Design a protein with these regions (language model features):
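Pre-recognition alpha-helix immediately N-terminal to the DNA-recognition helix
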Residues: 24-29
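Basic amphipathic alpha-helical segments that dock to polyanions
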Residues: 54-65
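Short capping segments at the starts of secondary-structure elements
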Residues: 21, 33-38
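Short, Lys/Arg-enriched N-terminal segment that forms or immediately precedes the first helix
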Residues: 2-16
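A short acidic, leucine-rich amphipathic alpha-helix
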Residues: 41-45
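Non-DNA-binding regulatory cores of transcription-related proteins
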Residues: 63-140
């Protein structure tokens, strides 16, 4: 068992969730996929686990902060393992590449704005769209 798989199972157990065989299969499939994935790609990578079970498991993994959800510029949704904790995304509109970044000052600014407006923040997601350095260079 990989360290990441063991950590994911431990975190699920730690928040009171059972680690069933289908959940274990989904976690293993996430570990085998490279980069962001769709529910369909994850379902294909977890043979024998139904789409509804994959979807529910991904939702639980999001709540346990083990998976991060991204909304792409075209409205499509992709997910990724998020063992590194909370982060944001720069998404290239040309090649579809995703770059993760963390900025505690930005997170503090978001929290301060929520507080100023009397808003109790439960969480946030930030995706920035544009052109990556490589695509910008290729475009001249």
């Amino acid at each position: 068992m990989t360290t990441e798989l063991a950590d994911a199972e431990s975190r699920l157990s730690g928040v009171g969730l059972r680690v069933t065989a289908p959940r274990r299969a989904v976690i293993a499939a996430i570990g085998a996929l490279e980069g962001p994935f769709t529910i369909e790609e994850l379902t294909a990578a977890a043979p024998g686990v139904g789409r509804a079970t994959v979807f529910r498991t991904v939702k639980l993994l999001q709540e346990a902060e083990l998976v991060c959800r991204m909304v792409l510029e075209d409205g499509g949704v992709r997910y990724e393992a998020s063992a590194g904790g909370h982060h944001h995304h720069l998404i290239c509109s040309v090649c579809g590449g995703v770059t993760e970044f963390s900025d505690p000052a930005l997170d503090l600014l978001i929290q301060e704005n929520a507080n100023l407006n009397g808003f109790q923040l439960a969480g946030h997601s930030l995706e920035l769209y544009g052109r990556c350095a490589e695509c910008t260079h290729r475009a001249g």
